[in-house]
Design a protein with these regions (language model features):
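N-terminal beta1-alpha1-beta2 module of alpha/beta enzyme domains
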Residues: 1-71, 175-177, 269, 274, ...
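Flexible, glycine-rich active-site loops centered on histidine and acidic residues
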Residues: 2-20, 82-154, 208-209, 269-271
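Hydrophobic faces of well-ordered beta-strands that scaffold small-molecule active sites
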Residues: 3-7, 39-41, 76-79, 107-111, ...
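An alpha-helical appendage that flanks or caps ligand/catalytic pockets
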Residues: 7, 30-32, 37, 131-173, ...
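Active-site mouth loops of central-metabolism enzymes
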Residues: 9-22, 80-90, 175-185, 236-247
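Short, acidic/polar
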Residues: 18-31, 92-95, 182-195, 243-257
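Conserved, mostly hydrophobic/aromatic
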Residues: 31, 43, 68, 99, ...
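Structural motif
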Residues: 34, 102, 195-196, 259
Length: 292
């Protein structure tokens, strides 16, 4: 099983705006140093209110990943996950392309239907009903795939119309950067995973729930003739638990790996993210042995 580090907290004691960049840089370097496979961040204008407050600091995700790309060499980079409403899909595909080029082929598109209504209303970003957000999500996936292909023609959807899908330079990864869809909605989200995605990200509530979601995804794959084994199953976990009880954490991961999970993202990396990441280093080889 692989490890990913999810950087979601910009509120650290004594860290003002002028020190956020250096701290992010050192955390990313530490993550790569311990053997993390992924480095991800959130895609929000405001900090999540279930985690802190809307007035706590939050940096724009893709700008931040471009910064991280310049100081790392190996880790895959993406947002967990991009809200489909935040950027026009043509622009989003161009942003991912740029990140892929500048990182020498390490970008992936993590995307979902968006949910944080307050930040949309605050900054004047349209926030349609859930049904329409899922329609826009599917069209965005189609547009991204077209822009990462040789097809430079038009795109005509119910919500988005593009006259030309020119995208130069092309992405480094072939045939395209991986697409990850976040969430475990059984009727729509997991169906879109089966149709369009290379990976999904599930919340690690418990092994039974994750196992059920995976079985639903398998059924969607069977219905459309998709090879389920092509899809990378990832999940979110908690770094504090992993550090405090590594043996218990690894036992949990063995159960998830048996279900098909191949990467765990550890979030909530605390007031000293560099130290928190380094504390995870002994887990990495033991985690890698699971499912090997």
């Amino acid at each position: 099983m692989q490890l990913g580090i999810h950087y979601m907290n910009f509120t650290q004691p004594g860290i003002g705006p002028e020190k956020m960049g250096p701290l992010l840089r050192e955390t990313a370097i530490a993550a790569e140093g311990i053997g993390s496979s992924w480095f991800t961040m959130m895609d929000h204008y405001f900090q999540m209110e279930q985690f802190a407050t809307a007035h706590d600091p939050m940096l724009e995700g893709y700008t931040s990943l471009g910064f991280v790309a310049a100081v790392t060499k190996r880790m895959q980079l993406g947002l967990m996950v991009t809200g489909v409403t935040y950027r026009h899909p043509g622009l989003l595909a161009k942003i991912i392309t740029t990140l892929d080029v500048l990182s020498e082929g390490r970008a992936f598109l993590g995307i979902g239907a968006a949910w944080y209504e307050r930040e949309h209303q605050a900054l004047g970003v349209p926030y349609p009903e859930l049904k329409e957000r899922f329609e826009r999500l599917e069209e965005t996936l189609q547009i991204a795939q077209q822009m990462w292909s040789d097809d430079e023609g038009s795109y005509a959807g119910a919500h988005y119309q593009l006259a030309e899908t020119i995208n130069v330079p092309a992405v480094v990864q072939k045939p395209r950067p991986p697409i990850l869809i976040g969430g475990g909605g059984e009727k729509k989200t997991l169906r879109l995973v089966a149709q369009y995605a290379d990976a999904c990200n599930l919340f690690a509530s418990d092994a039974a729930t994750v196992g059920h979601k995976i079985e639903v995804l398998k059924r969607h794959c069977d219905e459309i003739g998709r090879d389920f084994s092509e899809i990378k199953i990832t999940m979110m976990g908690a770094a504090p638990k992993a550090a405090a009880d590594p043996d218990g954490f690894l036992r949990d991961m063995e159960a998830y790996a048996a279900l098909g999970v191949s990467l765990v993202e550890l979030a909530n990396i605390g007031p000293d993210p560099v130290a928190a990441v380094r504390q995870l280093e002994p887990l990495v080889p033991r985690l890698a042995a699971i499912g090997a």
